[in-house]
């Protein structure tokens, strides 16, 4: 009873029961967060149902304009002997509530409340002693900062970064002049939209969706094919987080940095090579800043990989992403002391 009374004070109250998820073989539960500047917020913890007792677990954290739908990823991790959880952050996917502005954020540290609640639940309630974080794109920025700011108080054993969002994919002139100007303007007009939805499905979405040139189906209300209005407040929040990370974080845990082997700036006309590169971010930025995360960073570029490497169209790139992931997990696990 005392624990139940303390949970709301600690933040991240978790609903009492698992509920059936839309993905077959998965379940979900709600994490109640403290209200923010726009009102009530929640996060959602998703779990792959599995038999037997497991002490190792992976927590997946998605990127921007995204949510967890990669069923094959969770299934494979469970088949490899790990428990699998995914976190839909506040105002994303399963956690988006009526009236909320999707993906709204004013500081990357806002998400630390649900990360802390999820990790605490996986360890203390579910009984996992060995936890790894697998994070994609903006999730890679968020989780890297979280591990630094909390000094990894949760005892995470390893961090896997899948095409992390460590810098904006702008031209040098935009980086030097436009981005600081926009970031500074956020204090005066934070709700100003600086990038609106596109008239045509964006090229990255076309590389993913079966309806276009990809291999996957997902909820396009949660992962928007035409994008979503980007406000100055969100841009400044991301930029402030990136500037902190780019100074170095001194993380003291094994880190795997995974990227495609090249980036392409897509044009308006479809080209087959778009299915064989990162269309969203510049992979050179990931490497430039990834090595500054800590002293134990290993990396792998994947030939013909896409921005989300675990959604790659090229079969060899897709298979290699899994092979690299499991090699890293098993190496980390083998070096973990047993109690």
Predicted region positions:
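Catalytic nucleophile-loop/oxyanion-hole region of alpha/beta-hydrolase
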Residues: 64-65, 93-132, 316-318
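Conserved alpha/beta-hydrolase
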Residues: 66-74, 78-100
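Short beta-to-alpha linker loops that shape the active-site pocket of alpha/beta-hydrolase fold enzymes
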Residues: 64, 88-93, 165, 303-306
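N-terminal cap/lid segment of alpha/beta-hydrolase-fold proteins
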Residues: 14-52
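Catalytic active-site module of serine/aspartate enzymes centered on a nucleophile-bearing elbow/loop
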Residues: 296-339
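Short beta-strand element of the alpha/beta-hydrolase
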Residues: 55-63
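Serine-hydrolase catalytic core
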Residues: 195-301
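Alpha/beta-hydrolase-fold enzymes
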Residues: 138, 143-232
């Amino acid at each position: 009873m005392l624990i139940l009374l303390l949970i709301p004070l600690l933040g991240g109250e978790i609903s009492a029961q698992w509920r059936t998820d839309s993905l077959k073989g998965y379940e979900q539960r709600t994490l109640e967060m403290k209200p923010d500047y726009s009102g009530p917020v929640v996060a959602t913890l998703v779990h792959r149902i599995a038999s037997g007792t497991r002490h190792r677990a992976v927590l997946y954290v998605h990127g921007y304009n995204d949510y967890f739908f990669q069923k094959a990823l969770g299934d494979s991790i469970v088949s490899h002997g790990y428990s699998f959880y995914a976190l839909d952050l506040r105002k994303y996917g399963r956690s988006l509530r009526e009236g909320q502005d999707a993906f709204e954020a004013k500081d990357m540290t806002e998400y630390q409340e649900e990360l802390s609640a999820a990790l605490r639940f996986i360890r203390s309630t579910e009984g996992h002693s060995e936890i790894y974080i697998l994070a994609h794109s903006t999730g890679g920025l968020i989780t890297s900062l979280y591990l630094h700011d909390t000094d990894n108080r949760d005892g995470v054993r390893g961090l896997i970064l899948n095409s992390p969002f460590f810098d904006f994919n702008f031209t040098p002139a935009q980086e030097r002049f436009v981005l600081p100007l926009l970031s500074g303007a956020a204090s005066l007009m934070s709700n100003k939209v600086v990038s609106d939805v596109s008239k045509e499905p964006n090229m990255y979405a076309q590389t993913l969706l079966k309806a276009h040139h990809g291999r996957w189906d997902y909820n396009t209300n949660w992962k928007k094919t035409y994008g979503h209005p980007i406000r100055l407040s969100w841009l400044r929040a991301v930029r402030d987080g990136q500037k902190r990370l780019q100074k170095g974080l001194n993380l003291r845990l094994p880190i795997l940095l995974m990227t495609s082997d090249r980036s392409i700036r897509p044009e308006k006309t479809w080209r087959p090579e778009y299915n064989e590169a990162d269309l969203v971010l510049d992979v050179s930025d990931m490497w430039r800043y990834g090595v500054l995360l800590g002293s134990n960073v290993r990396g792998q570029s994947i030939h013909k990989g896409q921005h989300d490497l675990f959604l790659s169209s090229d079969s060899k790139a897709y298979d290699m992403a899994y092979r690299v992931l499991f090699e890293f997990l098993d190496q980390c696990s083998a070096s973990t002391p047993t109690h």
